[in-house]
Amino acid sequence: MINLRKTHPLMKIINQSFIDLPAPSNISAWWNFGSLLGACLIIQILTGFFLAMHYTSDTLTAFSSVAHICRDVNYGWLIRNLHANGASMFFMCLFLHVGRGIYYGSYLYKETWNIGVILLLTVMGTAFVGYVLPWGQMSFWGATVITNLLSAIPYIGTTLAEWIWGGFAVDKATLTRFFAFHFILPFIITALAIVHLLFLHETGSNNPSGINPDSDKIPFHPYYTIKDALGLILMFMVLLLLALFSPDLLGDPDNFSPANPLNTPPHIKPEWYFLFAYAILRSIPNKLGGVLALLASILILLIIPLLHTANQRSMMFRPVSQTLFWILAANLVTLTWIGGQPVEQPFIIIGQLASMLYFLLILVLMPLAGMFENYMLKPKW
């Protein structure tokens, strides 16, 4: 009998993607994050689906419906905690996945990289509209502050903001449409993830050395299925640890109070995974300038392939670039910390310096390091 997985039209696609796929023999645990992100997406869609069965997107009942889910729905507290902390796991994996791509030069697969950046932006948008849904204080004021940034766009800004709101402020219409966006976007993310994989499988995976691995490939199954399974178990353990023992660790206490347009919280800040971008936004005293810097902080990823000057693909054998990469990582941690601090000295100046260093590293120092390393590798005799 002819092997069904190699002949059946549907099974054939699965086989070529997850079973008989030729994979480099030396890819490390840093290559696990793709499958972990896929698992995160599935967890988020499933838990979100069950939450949507009980949630109501109305300003009068949204907050109560979330409380009802946690108190009265069977395992509702668990579903909600898994969904909220699943988002944190999603972003943790996303940041590590992007960092891996930068470190090992995976961005030179330009189509895969660009779809990945679009995926990152879409996930950020989904997380933002999702954070508004419980209709707590931070949900409401976060939505107000971020959507208000649209009004910085010259001429059409105010009209655009009111169009997004569906009125003159964040209100019932905004909440309803944000719920609709939050429901549809994960399916768009799933479609984009499939396209991301499609482009990746056109070229095959990169590997830590950055050298063409075609001469030494192994089948994806069983080698990388078992490796991915280990990663999944570890990630799921961390997620359960968070969801069961400290579900509110990464949340904001202000969100336990129902939204009140008449009472502004002392410190408006987004979830931890947006703090680095929020710090960059706040570091520029001009509204439009801040919005442009915020956009640039993410969109800069699109031009990273153009800034690659080194003769070697990976940073594995490039100590100067490695040093700058880890400075960039530390800088992002600093920005995340600053984003959660009040707007006062010394946090203002630290945030401004860290924001400046962020762009300086990516646009100037790392390309220069690549050129310097090329020069150092040239024979001098």
From Swiss-Prot:
Keywords on record: Electron transport, Heme, Iron, Membrane, Metal-binding, Mitochondrion, Mitochondrion inner membrane, Respiratory chain, Transmembrane, Transmembrane helix, Transport, Ubiquinone
Manner of cofactor binding, per the entry note: Binds 2 heme b groups non-covalently.
Binding site for heme b b566: H97, H196
Binding site for heme b b562: H83, H182
A Gene Ontology cellular-component term: mitochondrial inner membrane
GO biological process, one term: mitochondrial electron transport, ubiquinol to cytochrome c
Record's subcellular location: Mitochondrion inner membrane
TM segment ranges: 33-53, 77-98, 113-133, 178-198, 226-246, 288-308, 320-340, 347-367
Membrane topology: Multi-pass membrane protein
Entry GO MF terms: metal ion binding; ubiquinol-cytochrome-c reductase activity
Cofactor: heme b
Annotated residues for binding of a ubiquinone: H201
Pfam families in UniProt: Cytochrom_B_C, Cytochrome_B
SUPFAM superfamilies: a domain/subunit of cytochrome bc1 complex (Ubiquinol-cytochrome c reductase), Transmembrane di-heme cytochromes
PANTHER family in the cross-refs: CYTOCHROME B (PTHR19271:SF16)
More info: Heme 1 (or BL or b562) is low-potential and absorbs at about 562 nm, and heme 2 (or BH or b566) is high-potential and absorbs at about 566 nm.
Subunit comment: The cytochrome bc1 complex contains 11 subunits: 3 respiratory subunits (MT-CYB, CYC1 and UQCRFS1), 2 core proteins (UQCRC1 and UQCRC2) and 6 low-molecular weight proteins (UQCRH/QCR6, UQCRB/QCR7, UQCRQ/QCR8, UQCR10/QCR9, UQCR11/QCR10 and a cleavage product of UQCRFS1). This cytochrome bc1 complex then forms a dimer.
Task of the protein: Component of the ubiquinol-cytochrome c reductase complex (complex III or cytochrome b-c1 complex) that is part of the mitochondrial respiratory chain. The b-c1 complex mediates electron transfer from ubiquinol to cytochrome c. Contributes to the generation of a proton gradient across the mitochondrial membrane that is then used for ATP synthesis.
Family: Belongs to the cytochrome b family.
Name of protein: Cytochrome b
